Amino acid sequence: MSKKEIPYKIYLDESEMPKQWYNFRADMINKPAPLLNPATGKPVTLEELSGIFCEELAKQELDDKTPYIDIPDEILQFYKMYRPAPLVRAYHLERYLKTPAKIYYKFEGNNTSGSHKLNSAIAQAYYAKNQGLKGVTTETGAGQWGTALSMACAFLGLDCQVFMVKVSYEQKPFRREVMRTYGANVTPSPSEKTAVGRKIRAEFPDTNGSLGCAISEAVEAATTQEGYRYVLGSVLAQVMIHQSVIGLESKIALDKYGEKPDIIIGCAGGGSNLGGLIAPFMGEKLRGEADYRFIAVEPKSCPSFTRGTYAYDFCDTGAICPLAKMYTLGSSFMPAPNHAGGLRYHGMSSVLSQLYDDKLMEAVSVSQTDVFAAAEEFAKVEGILPAPESSHAIRVAMDEAIKCRETGEEKTILFGLTGTGYFDMYAYEKFNDGKMENYTLTDEEIAASIAKLPKVPGLN
């Protein structure tokens, strides 16, 4: 089809929405390494994992063989409040960059949570409700996940306890208030509420917190209260299963117009958005049906892929969770107060880590001043104020489009616009005032954290 025949926004009909999630682990030749029980060093069992997660979610976490999982009708009906999400052809950005490249972005910010996180929040809350639980606990970085979960829990009548990374709790008070508006109890992490929080505060008295800290507190809170389970917004495979609706919708929309992306780009903190966006395309690559170039974009201040070590590590700072094999900076790593709070995680999804180790995807790291420069250009040209996390993908998508301008190649670029930045104005203020700092880790800082990796006989 010609360029003129492709609309600015491609909206699918509700009848075209995916009815199943896609679990691309089923198509992976090299499966992700199993989660390990830190006490035994052996793969975790369903019974062990069900003590932390809802039973159905524990089953999804351990299932690397079932390619498609039916989406319960109750979840589909909830999705219809904000899905299908638009796939946007960035004509204005293309003209601004004077590039022959075609640029598309999947916009996930058209719901009250402001991001893609609601896709998994409603699924996890649904399974918790079906199990008869009183409530759930969780962590949140920038607050998008906590907001999404508070919405889902309010809708289903569940109690919601959120441990929010301290620096984001202070930088993003309005997102905190959205969570409270939906009935969530929000605590800055590390806190005095949990034993692990008190321990971390004693060891790192000046800490700004981290996702790893908040995870530890949320897990402790879940396992010490009757009728509660822990749910999470990223990193684990169950989350990427739910987020596959992003990529599935994107592929359906592109296929309708005969479009095929050459490059697919997503920001990477724990991997939920990136894994969801690439899911059906990676499936085709794994099955040998098509080839794509996948690029994960992470902050230079927290470069798990580009400077981390591929090893077994704890998913949390307090060493409560199972061990996962992933690209990691070490669970004791305390990231700088980067404004992309959702990307301040020491590790990376085991699924994406395996794909990266198998050279099936690439990764780059970018500085936050370059990211915010791209964010402001995008906002002025495309009319959406992007979240700092999303802006990492925007930065690299623009860079790839500029390369096409220089080479004359007419590549098709797809990136994930994970959400809006309307609650991130403190970060934009710092950038506009010229007070934003870049944080680049030294080799010594990384080595010190990596040296504390757990000793796993025969593995680490």
Name what the model sees in each region.
Residues S120, A128-V167, K260-L274, F294, ...:
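A short, small-residue-rich loop immediately preceding and capping a beta-strand
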Residues A123-L133, T147-D159, R180-T181, I278-G288, ...:
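Alpha-helix C-terminal capping segments
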